[in-house]
């Protein structure tokens, strides 16, 4: 305690004025100027922002001088992040090439040298700029060929009556990989990357050859379109038809094949649609019945706490009840362990205040 009191007293102004007052410096008061210039023991930390050779290294101005107030002196306390700083840390300087523009170095006021590019990076840039002229000519020739082929593909497709989606489906039939309509559209518009255009071109060339030679390609395309439409189609049942199916399910949850066909004819649905609906409805009923059985078992088990309800009185003092209702202020809780006889809580008188509107 004595050490703490001494340290606090050393850094607080005296009650009778500053060190320059008529009373002179007192033994418990340390002048801020002396505190700011304290160097500390050799090899130990210095105190204050003005310690060491130049505070410009940290990019902050030195601490302002003390300000005069009425009857005393205020000092500049230690700032955030500038507390006890080792002397060795003040002597560290930034390495060359890392100092930013406009930051002066500490050695003779010389400005840092600008960052130089490594020779490896320059070499790579030169290699990129100095491309082989023969390769560039080949790439340009390939681009022209791709443009001409894209125009030919579009003309052939429109002439034969194929859509872009049909071209993608027939590519799947012929080569086992279906392409989307967006891909064919982007190929014709030359919006794909150069690599993807080169990969897709041989497949489309084979499609053009098949379209010219194979007369059944249109029929194959239509059949594949129907198959894809069946895969993508999602069954939607009207509310009226769904209500009729619910009534039939209540009468017969598991109909036979003949009954399913009869129901499909009456409601205008496919047999598979009716069969799948009844299967899904039975599964839904099983899930709901299992949930109901679990709920009944939980309710039959009762409360997880042993013992009956115990009433605990509230803390003594006035309690405001709901206006118009004179109910006792007790909270019903369940105790995990029943209280033995003779250890019940003593009765506490509770004053219940009525509603302010009906009070006399």
From Swiss-Prot:
Identify the SMART domains for this entry.
HOX, POU
> What gene is this protein translated from?
POU5F1
Tell me the residues on which Phosphothreonine occurs. Answer: 235
The Swiss-Prot or TrEMBL record marks DNA binding at 230-289
Q: Does the keyword Ubl conjugation apply?
A: yes
What is the recorded post-translational modification?
Sumoylation enhances the protein stability, DNA binding and transactivation activity. Sumoylation is required for enhanced YES1 expression.
Query: What does the entry's free-text domain comment contain?
Result: The POU-specific domain mediates interaction with PKM. The 9aaTAD motif is a transactivation domain present in a large number of yeast and animal transcription factors.
Q: What is this protein called?
A: POU domain, class 5, transcription factor 1
- Record family assignment: Belongs to the POU transcription factor family. Class-5 subfamily.
